[in-house]
């Protein structure tokens, strides 16, 4: 079975949906003329369906007058195309309203009668926009340009960006006679004479300009009103009061800052003395016994301990722990308050040297095998 027939069977007969020319052409990727032909062939094989026709042609009584220009005469009896949607029952009545030469095509197919054609109107509007009110023969006859895709251009006036002109008093421009010399007189003279004259004239004008501007200037600020004696006294009293208030505020702020500094220094001194008195010197090392040239006791050593905090994370802290010791008396040269962070370690290399010196009779293996 062909693809278009299978699609129409499923959509129109099985699903009872409306299929238009545009739907079929988009689904099968074909032209609208080919889609109209497929709808006509499918309706001939299935007479029980309800077709919707599209009729377009020139109406009998509806005619308009088209004006090309204001000066030219209007084109009378200009033809206008009309588009009508109808079902099979009202087809003959709609065709009778149009002149001969109209065209009738099947625009849509459905399995049930359709009473309202509003959902099909947008597609009809698109078809109507493609047609034009005039033909190429009319363009040749009346002399206007024929183009189906032409759109009248609407020109917008740009807003004026120029600021309104200021009212400046017009002055008569004084031109020196030296500037307006004829070309005949300047032929045999120096080339730079004209430039020198222009510089001199410009310098004279610049000297005159400030005097003229000074005359034209008007006082911008209004004249001060004459104050009475009572108003002057009140103003002077207000100034004196404001000055006294400013001086009092500045002196009080200076005294307050000095008092704050003294209080903070005293507070820091008190904290320092309290900390010193609260933390007496604790013994870092305690000797329990001394016998046989050896000292035995315990001392505080700093060690790192890992603990868990409230959230369960491991935290390393540095703590002081008592550790017992036993050492020779002559080694300890410090007092009892000495803190020993690291335990004393004996070098292994020195031990080996001492043992080698203590056994002079020991010989190497090579010397033993060398002598026989």
Curated annotation (Swiss-Prot):
GO terms for biological process: cell division; DNA strand elongation involved in DNA replication; DNA strand elongation involved in mitotic DNA replication; DNA synthesis involved in UV-damage excision repair; mitotic DNA replication lagging strand elongation; mitotic DNA replication leading strand elongation; nucleotide-excision repair, DNA gap filling. Residues 156-264, 352-372 are annotated as: Disordered. It is found in: Nucleus. The modification Phosphoserine is found at residue 163. It holds the Pfam family CDC27. Residues 160-173, 355-365 have a biased composition (Polar residues). Gene3D superfamilies: DNA polymerase delta, p66 (Cdc27) subunit, wHTH domain. Its main location: nucleus. The keyword DNA damage does not apply. Keywords: Cell cycle, Cell division, DNA replication, DNA-directed DNA polymerase, Mitosis, Nucleotidyltransferase, Nucleus, Phosphoprotein, Transferase. Residues 174-190, 209-239 have a biased composition (Basic and acidic residues). It comes from the Eukaryota. GO terms for molecular function: DNA-directed DNA polymerase activity. Heterotetramer that consist of the pol3, cdc1, cdc27 and cdm1 subunits. Cdc27 interacts with cdc1 and is required for dimerization of the tetramer. This is DNA polymerase delta subunit 3. It comes from Schizosaccharomyces pombe (strain 972 / ATCC 24843).
């Amino acid at each position: 079975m062909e693809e278009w027939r299978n699609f129409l069977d499923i959509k129109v007969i099985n699903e009872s949906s409306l299929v238009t020319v545009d739907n079929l052409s988009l689904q099968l990727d074909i032209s609208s003329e080919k889609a109209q032909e497929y709808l006509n062939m499918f309706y001939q094989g299935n007479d029980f369906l309800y077709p919707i026709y599209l009729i377009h042609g020139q109406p009998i009584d509806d005619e308009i007058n088209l004006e090309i220009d204001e000066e030219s005469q209007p084109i009378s009896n200009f033809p206008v195309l009309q588009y009508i949607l109808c079902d099979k029952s009202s087809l003959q009545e709609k065709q009778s309203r149009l002149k001969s030469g109209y065209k009738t095509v099947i625009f849509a197919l459905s399995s049930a009668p359709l009473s309202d054609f509003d959902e099909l109107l947008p597609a009809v509007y698109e078809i109507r926009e493609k047609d034009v009110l005039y033909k190429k023969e009319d363009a040749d006859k009346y002399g206007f340009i024929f183009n189906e895709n032409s759109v009248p251009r609407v020109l917008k006036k740009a807003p004026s960006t120029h600021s309104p002109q200021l009212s400046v008093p017009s002055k008569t421009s004084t031109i020196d006679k030296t500037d307006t010399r004829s070309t005949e007189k300047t032929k045999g003279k120096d080339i730079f004479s004209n430039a020198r004259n222009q510089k001199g004239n410009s310098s004279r004008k610049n000297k005159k300009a400030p005097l003229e501007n000074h005359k034209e200037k008007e006082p911008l600020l209004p004249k001060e009103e004459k104050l009475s004696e009572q108003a002057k006294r009140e103003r002077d009293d207000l100034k004196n009061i404001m000055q006294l208030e400013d001086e009092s505020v500045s002196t009080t702020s200076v005294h307050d800052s000095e008092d704050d500094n003294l209080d903070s220094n005293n507070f820091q001194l008190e904290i320092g003395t309290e900390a010193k008195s609260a933390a007496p010197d604790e013994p870092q090392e305690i000797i329990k016994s001394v016998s046989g040239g050896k000292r035995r006791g315990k001392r505080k050593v700093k060690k790192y301990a890992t603990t868990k905090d409230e959230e369960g994370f491991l935290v390393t802290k540095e703590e002081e722990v008592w550790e017992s010791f036993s050492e020779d008396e002559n080694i300890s040269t410090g007092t009892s308050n000495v803190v020993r962070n690291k335990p004393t370690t004996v070098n292994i290399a020195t031990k080996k040297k001492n043992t080698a010196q203590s056994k002079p009779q020991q010989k190497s293996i090579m010397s033993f095998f060398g002598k026989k």
